[in-house]
Amino acid sequence: MQIEFLGTGAGSPSKQRNVSSLALRLLEERNAIWLFDCGEATQHQILHTTIRPRKVEKIFITHLHGDHIFGLPGFLSSRSFQGGDEPLTIYGPKGIKDFVQTALKVSESRLSYPLKFVELTGDGEVFKDQTFTVTARRLDHKIASFGYRVEEAAHPGELMVEKVRQAGIPSGPLYGQLKRGEVVTLPDGRTVDGHDFIGAPQPGRIVAILGDTRVTDNAVKLAKGADVLVHEATFAKNEQRLAHNYYHSTSVQAATVAKKAGAQRLLLNHISARYVGRYANELAYQVRDIFEQTRVVNDLDVIEIPFKER
């Protein structure tokens, strides 16, 4: 599991940062990629990565401001040209369906794959299968804005091979049966339960990806115990008034959310063009006393999300 940042800027593109988009790379977990937001030129940023558009199976839109959605029509069309024929689902606030369908209709674009929309009207679970659960919560922005919590299901425990050997169980196909938790009859007549030879499950990982927002309790709820929290930091430490007036957050407010939520790491994005180079990095330095594991991300950064140590 990795996060690859395709755009980390705020409002409009700059020479250093494109507008909002990131990819949650789930190639090992489900041979797929999930996009979160799709600002202008997202597909151009993808050209600088190993991402294949046909691997994108879901797109989660946080809100309908242009810097988060203007890249959608182009990306969806290019996915058709590049061999994408599997269904794609777009999640987002009410209005996302009208936006996409209008753009495709006016441009007379035809997609080679089924396109499904899930429009959000409130807080709750928006997707669940055997491997992942995605929950959305409303944030505090000028228009409807959501954050997403992606929870991975626990992985089965490993077969404790040494314990199996000590029990005198011969190697071979029996090991596979035990690993599946089956009750097995051994050649010597003994009956053993596979569950007795399997270690504790490995807890799944949790990623919280927030849209534009002011300070809100829902941000803390989304980030509770997260391995990684992606939070906007449009404004610096001492600009609380500006942040409030423009419905955004400061770096300090983002760090406070991470601390309250008990998150493991904080990745600051949605960085204003006023902060360039070391001035952008200072957004992280100024909050290390609040939340040490803080980093300002840049376009095309790839962040590994390992399992927690047992």
Swiss-Prot record:
Family matches, as SMART domains: Lactamase_B
Reaction catalyzed: Endonucleolytic cleavage of RNA, removing extra 3' nucleotides from tRNA precursor, generating 3' termini of tRNAs. A 3'-hydroxy group is left at the tRNA terminus and a 5'-phosphoryl group is left at the trailer molecule
Coiled-coil regions listed: none
Single GO MF annotation: zinc ion binding
Assigned keywords, A-Z: Endonuclease, Hydrolase, Metal-binding, Nuclease, tRNA processing, Zinc
Active site: 67
Domain of life per record: Bacteria
Binding of Zn(2+) 2, residues: 67-68, 212, 270
Residues the record lists as binding Zn(2+) 1: 63, 65, 141, 212
NCBIfam families (alphabetical): PRK00055.1-3, RNase_Z
Subunit structure: Homodimer.
Family: Belongs to the RNase Z family.
Name listed for the protein in its UniProt record: Ribonuclease Z
Source organism phylogeny: Bacteria, Bacillati, Bacillota, Bacilli, Lactobacillales
